[in-house]
């Protein structure tokens, strides 16, 4: 009987969830990971694990900041955001979410046993509910409030 790699099976199931839910983000990410896994590129997994999250956050930040950099959102609009209650609330929520993300990074580093559950939950949220894969850090931050930071 041929050996079936359980990790490949998990990745295939997750890719299938991405396809079924028409979520190209999940599908593409999982297919890239599958390609890395089954080729000699698999020796780069330690690098991907170490820097992938940071690179992803940089790319996400570029996407979020692009309207300011391109001039679509002007400097005066940014300054006026401090004068409206909705914008002030958005700033406060942004601060809170960033704080939660920081707690999440700490929890994921100090309690790696929770990472698998957070990742599965995030992929399910992305695949089934059209979410975006920023969930693990925020989910870990929320989890840290419930179970403690370390």
Curated annotation (Swiss-Prot):
It is a multi-pass membrane protein. It is found in: Cell membrane. The chain crosses the membrane at residues 1-21, 51-71, 82-102, 127-147. The keyword Transport does not apply. Keywords: Cell membrane, Membrane, Transmembrane, Transmembrane helix. The keyword Membrane applies. InterPro entries: UPF0756_TM. It comes from the Bacteria. One of its GO terms (cellular component) is plasma membrane. Pfam families: DUF441. Belongs to the UPF0756 family. This is UPF0756 membrane protein PC1_1142.
């Amino acid at each position: 009987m041929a050996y079936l790699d359980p990790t490949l099976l998990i990745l295939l199931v997750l890719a299938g969830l991405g396809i079924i839910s028409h979520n190209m983000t999940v599908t593409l990410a999982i297919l890239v990971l599958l390609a890395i896994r089954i080729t000699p590129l698999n020796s780069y997994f330690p690098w991907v694990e170490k820097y992938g999250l940071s690179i992803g956050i940089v790319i996400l930040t570029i996407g979020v900041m692009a309207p300011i950099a391109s001039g679509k959102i002007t400097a005066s609009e940014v300054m006026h955001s401090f004068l409206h209650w909705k914008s002030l609330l958005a700033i406060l929520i942004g601060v809170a979410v960033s704080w939660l993300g920081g707690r999440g990074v700490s929890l994921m580093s100090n309690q790696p046993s929770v990472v698998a559950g957070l990742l599965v939950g995030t992929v399910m949220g992305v695949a089934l509910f059209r979410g975006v894969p920023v969930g693990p850090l925020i989910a870990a931050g929320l989890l840290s409030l419930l179970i403690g930071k370390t």
